[in-house]
Amino acid sequence: MDKNSKVCVTGASGYIGSFLVKELLHRGYTVHATLRNLGEPSKVGLLKGLPHAETRLKLFEADIYDHDAFALAIQDCQVVIHLATPFQHNTHNTEYKNTSEAAVAGVKSIVQSCLRSESVKRLVYTGSVVAASPLNNDGSGFKDSIDETCWTPLNLSFSYCDDFFHDYVHSKTLAEREVLSFNGKGIEVVSLACGLVGGDTLQSFIAGSMGVLISQLTNDSAKYRILRFMEELLGKLPILHIQDAVEAHIFCMENPHINGRILCASNFLKTADIASHVQKCYPEIRISQEFIEDTKRETGWGSKKLEEMGFQYRYDLEKIVEDSLHCARRMGITPEN
């Protein structure tokens, strides 16, 4: 892929999005970045302050609830990386009754804008592993392993699940199915279903996923509940470093032989294993027993698609935890001792 190419990144001011824009600019790409509101100084300032932003970054205002707004940002781009997703339903919007309808309509509109542009050849959609639960459809237990063939059975109720995550799981699952239905129909579609991401951040606050990842260290009951929800949904916890997440997106963007669905995580482990690692490597951090629950579950990680195409993860569990902990301390969030 020509490094002079233009790449559109939706949801560019988010946790993954900001790192992705930074790396794309570093590699010489011109980036069309969308934000919900160009009137937010912190988000605009973050992106405008990146190296090479002055010459190769163009910002566009676009909301997932206003689909036509993305067309201008997509025009003249060769690739679109679609990270933007509605986390909470806009109650002022009467066109969609929930986040699932908005997310599905959003990816459909993005694809249609890509096709109308006549310049976009590839769409990389940032999915989530919450759409790939290895639970049996009847809720009787888990399959032996999780891979790209797994789809979360939306007819089931999930342990530790509240209304927010019920809606999130449904919206990510339905939106991913929708975007993949366009693969090979005038555009190459890659859905990169990422695990829980940790590491560093460019934002001025701890990203939600990182806060969840280190919730055992900080004794944060609310975020630990989310961690356990993901473990009960997926069998174990798939995690990866932010730098690996960014590299995987660019790898899928630049590799013309990749399309379809790909799961993305460097580690797949029990939450009890995370606690055990922390207690071994950071003996000064005491984790309360209520944050250590061993499921004894042995669900395997069966996805090798990304590695078989030549991708290599560079960050292991030790580095993910180390960088997440360092970032949290920098933000003033210190583990309970």
Name each model-derived stretch.
Residues 2-31:
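N-terminal Rossmann NAD(P)H-binding glycine-rich loop of SDR-like oxidoreductase domains
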Residues 185-187, 199-214, 252-262:
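Glycine/proline-rich active-site loop of Rossmann-fold NAD(P)-dependent oxidoreductases
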Residues 216-262:
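Alpha-helical substrate-binding/gating segment
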Residues 246-296, 300, 325-328, 332-337:
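Mid/C-terminal beta-alpha module of Rossmann-like enzyme folds, strongest
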Residues 38-105, 117:
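NAD(P)H-binding glycine-rich loop region in Rossmannoid oxidoreductase-like domains
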Residues 82, 86, 91-168, 190:
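Conserved Rossmann-fold NAD(P)-dependent oxidoreductase catalytic core, especially the SDR/UDP-sugar
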Residues 127-128, 175-201:
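Conserved beta-loop-beta element that borders a ligand/cofactor-binding pocket
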Residues 242, 292-312:
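Conserved C-terminal active-site "lid" loop/helix of NAD(P)H-dependent oxidoreductases
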